[in-house]
Amino acid sequence: MIYWIFLALAITAEVIGTLSMKYATVNGQITGHIVMYIMITASYILLSLAIKRVALGVAYALWEGIGILFITLFSVMWFDEPFSLTKLAGLAILVIGIVMLKSGTRKAQGDSGLKARQKERHHATV
């Protein structure tokens, strides 16, 4: 469960970092850039912790996909970026793809399965 929390925090940090970058660009303040660097760094660190137990493909798809979804929505609300039916359709397809990817992923075997496979590789056969 903690690894999913790491992933949620990574997504949140990515969204905050990216929005801070836009804020800094619009307002010309260095604070936005500093927040961006800190949050993007935190996002990658948290993502690396999350993929210890969450499948990489699922974690990355959720990290990027949900990040794109929230960044787009907040950009429309806060920075008056245009929104169209085409963007809405793209976001809907994105969400459908994430759901399909998540539902099609098997549960990880855990460390014991991985360690057993690694031991098999290191033993010589006679």
From Swiss-Prot:
SUPFAM superfamilies linked: Multidrug resistance efflux transporter EmrE (SSF103481)
Segments passing through the bilayer: 1-21, 30-50, 54-74, 81-101
Matching PANTHER family: SMR FAMILY PROTON-DEPENDENT DRUG EFFLUX TRANSPORTER SUGE (PTHR30561), SPERMIDINE EXPORT PROTEIN MDTJ (PTHR30561:SF2)
Topological category with respect to the lipid bilayer: Multi-pass membrane protein
The organism's place on the tree of life at top rank: Bacteria
Organism from which the protein derives: Sodalis glossinidius (strain morsitans)
Compartments where found: Cell inner membrane
One Gene Ontology term of the molecular function aspect: antiporter activity
Protein name: Spermidine export protein MdtJ
Main location: membrane
UniProt keywords, alphabetically: Cell inner membrane, Cell membrane, Membrane, Transmembrane, Transmembrane helix, Transport
Gene name as annotated: mdtJ
GO biological process annotation, one example: glycine betaine transport
